[in-house]
A protein has these predicted regions:
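Catalytic-domain carbohydrate-binding cleft regions of carbohydrate-active enzymes
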Residues: 1-203
Length: 203
């Protein structure tokens, strides 16, 4: 209230009714790297946005990638040999695993069409240059998606203005825009990003 002209951002993994008025961006917390987890993120994001939280995001690629070898990844819990329930990723070699690279690229593609585009995690590098070199498929796909996100910024900014002026949400269930279409009601793995882009992530 003392700085009404300031735009705030509060990135948090939890919130409460009406916390969106305080610049809250919710994210799904420290998730682990698996195809199933990535698919579930679509439902989680739609549920949050339908609950009135217009800004939602996730850890692209999963926060945790490994399962067995977490003690060697430099976390502060490395001296405790007790298995950690949360360290459940499917990729012991992290970015060196081509399976993880494919998952990461697909998750990255989904992230382009979220209110906040955010790659974050522990136990493996996530910078683009760790996924190959120019001319190689994983690297090139990531670069193209970064460029696409930048091209979408005027559209994203316009939709952000609608959140303020019209109580809008960027990540939209198909029920919002196609309420009369019974097929749309049955689709939980697609969503609208604003009013012009239909998104169906590869999961």
């Amino acid at each position: 209230k003392s700085n009404p002209d300031k735009r705030v951002l509060n990135l948090t993994r939890s919130g409460y009714a009406s916390s969106q008025k305080f610049g809250t961006v919710l994210w799904s917390g420290d998730i682990f790297a698996s195809w199933d987890t990535m698919k579930k993120q679509i439902h989680e994001g739609l549920n949050m946005c339908m609950s009135g939280m217009p800004y939602w995001t996730l850890d692209i690629g999963g926060f945790f990638t490994v399962n067995e070898n977490w003690q060697h990844r430099g976390c502060s819990c490395s001296k405790d040999p007790t298995p950690k329930w949360f360290w459940r990723g499917d990729y012991e070699e992290g970015v060196e695993d081509y399976g993880y690279r494919e998952l990461y690229v697909r998750w990255f593609e989904q992230g382009v069409f979220l209110p906040m585009f955010r790659s974050h995690g522990t136990d493996t590098p996530r910078e683009v240059w760790n996924f190959g070199r120019p001319g190689e498929p994983f690297y090139d796909a990531l670069v193209k998606n970064i460029e696409l996100r930048y091209r979408l910024m005027p559209y994203i900014y316009s939709n952000a203005a609608r959140i303020w002026t019209d109580d809008y949400t960027m990540m939209r269930s198909l029920l919002f825009d196609f309420a009369q279409d019974k097929r749309a009601a049955a689709l939980g793995d697609e969503y609208m990003f604003g009013d012009s882009l239909l998104v169906c992530p590869v999961t």
